């Protein structure tokens, strides 16, 4: 009886140890930053959901910034991590926006198919410290996201040819909003580069 009980305890201890070792040796899930077979057109044609909650207030003029919004630090950190996983992006100080914003620069080896959509240099978009962004999109998408509450067209969107789809994307307050925000950043990247990158995720 004692031998049977001892054997059972030994088996349980060994099983737990084996499970612990297996868990500690598990390969971490890698983040996705690969291209996809889904074309940029198909991604851009996927209807956006309605954004819940009140529309975020902005200045409505240049400098075009959000007003009275308190960013969520964890969501902001995740936005920066995911946005700069897109291929060939460099994180630099902005040359377009206010000090403190972060420019999203295309590396020299990344082709640009819509240079007129970029305001200056190779900084196709920038992220403000509160997690809002300015980025170019196709006009149809810009109008849709404005209608569904995800952002608004820039006050200078009608000033220059190519800027028609220049938008502010509102800050994300939770993971669901962050997913849409990263999708739209990816669509902007695809719009100016002609690539078909998938939205990065971890």
What is each of the regions a protein language model found here?
Residues 1-7:
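Sec-dependent signal peptide recognition
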Residues 13-15:
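C-terminal motif of bacterial Sec signal peptides marking the signal peptidase cleavage site
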Residues 17-23:
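Bacterial lipoprotein signal-peptidase II cleavage site
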Residues 25-202:
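Charge-dense, helix-prone N-terminal extensions
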